[in-house]
Amino acid sequence: MISIFNFELFKKRLNLFLEKIEDLGGEVEPLTIEKPATEEEIKAVEAQLGYTLPPHFREVLLENTAHLEFWWYLYHFLQKNKDFLPDEICGIFQGKLRFGLDLLLLYEEHRAGWQKDVFPNYEDEYDRVWHNKMFFQKVFNGDYIAIELEPDNYGKVVYVSHDGSENHGLYIADNFKEFLMNYAAVGWTGGEDWQWEPFYTKDKGIDPTCENAQTWYKVLGINPKELEG
C-alpha cells in the first residue's frame, strides 16, 4: 500500500476512517481543508522563522492546503466494548491531525522556549532532539511531531518528546508527503506515540502494510483495497 503522494487519495483515506469510526458510534469532526497558501504568505512566515520551509511541507501548503484538521474519538465506545481491540493495538482511542502555516510561528515559540529552559545542551543526546526542528503538530500529551532541519537527516519527520519517551528522536517518515500518506492509511491514530507505535516498522516508519495495520483494518471493517487509488 506504499503510495506516492496523491492529495485526493490522502483525503479519501481520512474520510474513510471518519466514516468507519462514526459507524461504530464514535465522535468525529468533518475533515477541514482550507485553501492553499500563497507564495507571499509562505515567504512572510519564512522571514520570521529565518529559514526556508522543508520542500515537501512547503509544496503541500502551496499546492494543497494552508491548514488542515482531522479528528475522531473512540474512547467512550471502547469503554463500553473493552474487548473490541486486540491487545497489540489496545492503546488506540483517537486520531488527530492539525497542521498549518498559521501554526508554525507559535510552535517555533514553544520549541525555542523548551530548548532554552529545559533542553539547552546541544551536546546532550536527549536535548539535541529539541534543536533545529520545525514543529508542525502538537500532540495532546505535550509532545510534538516535527521535521528535521539538521543536514544529515534533513526533511525527515521525527517525534519529539518532552517527558522521556523512548520514541524521542525517532524518525517515522523520510519526508512530509510520505508521512501524510502512510499515517492517513492507518487513520492518523494518536498522535501520542503509543497510538502509532503498533504500526511502526524499523527503517520504514509508520507502515500501513504491517501485521498490526491489517488487524486494525479488520476490526474497523476496512478492506485494504479501499485505501488504494
PLM regions and their residue ranges:
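A surface-exposed partner-binding patch
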Residues: 1-141, 213-229
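Alpha-helical interaction segments
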Residues: 47, 61, 104, 169, ...
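A short, compositionally biased
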Residues: 131, 152-154
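Hydrophobic side chains in beta-strands
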Residues: 136-138, 149, 159
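Broad, structure-driven detector of short, well-ordered beta-strand segments within folded domains
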Residues: 143-150
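Short aromatic-glycine-(Arg/Gly/Cys) micro-motifs in beta-strand/loop hairpins
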Residues: 154-160
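Compact, glycine/acidic-enriched structural inserts
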Residues: 161-187
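Acidic, proline/glycine-rich low-complexity IDRs
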Residues: 184-229
